[in-house]
Regions:
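Glycine-rich, positively charged N-terminal anion/phosphate-binding segment
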Residues: 12-19, 34-109
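Alpha-helix-loop-beta-strand connector modules within alpha/beta enzyme cores
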Residues: 75-83, 132-147
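Ala/Thr-enriched low-complexity intrinsically disordered regions
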Residues: 2-4, 10
């Protein structure tokens, strides 16, 4: 596919609504989760300029850490336009399930499990893209979160 053909497709694709389960995102201009970037003010700003969706910074899936100031800041959804999305990261099925429920109780309508971050410090904890090395673990994580 050439750049010119991508440009021709872009307006149609980007402006088409996207449905994720029971949530509708007005367009496909999605701001990816970025550590140190996609905090609450940044997400609200992006949405005010037309982004259909903006995902929180990665939040570690250990609810024991959620009382920390940094964790509370990352999971702050005050004033955000729905649908609200939180990204969580971890490798323990029970902790991931608890973190998912915590984010939902905190206002998130969509919870994204980080399976793409290549950062060394994330992968060393068998999280992010390192999860893709273990299909059985991914299945256990998804089963715990969905069920």
């Amino acid at each position: 596919m050439t750049f010119a053909s991508i440009q021709r497709l872009t307006p149609h694709l980007l402006l088409t609504p996207l449905n994720i389960h029971n949530q509708t995102i007005d367009n496909r201009l999605i701001v990816a989760p970025m550590a140190g970037v996609t905090d609450n003010p940044s997400r609200r700003l992006c949405k005010s300029f037309g982004a259909g969706h903006a995902v929180s910074e990665m939040i570690i899936a250990d609810t024991a850490l959620y009382a920390r100031k940094k964790s509370l800041y990352r999971a702050n959804f005050d004033g955000e336009i729905a649908p609200i999305s939180a990204q969580i990261a971890g490798a323990d099925p029970d902790k991931l399930a608890d973190a998912t429920q915590f984010q939902i109780d905190n206002g998130a309508q969509i919870v994204d499990i980080n399976m793409g971050c290549p950062a060394k410090k994330v992968c060393q904890k068998m999280a992010g893209s390192a999860l893709l090395q273990d299909e059985n673990l991914v299945k256990r994580l998804l089963d715990a979160v969905v069920n």
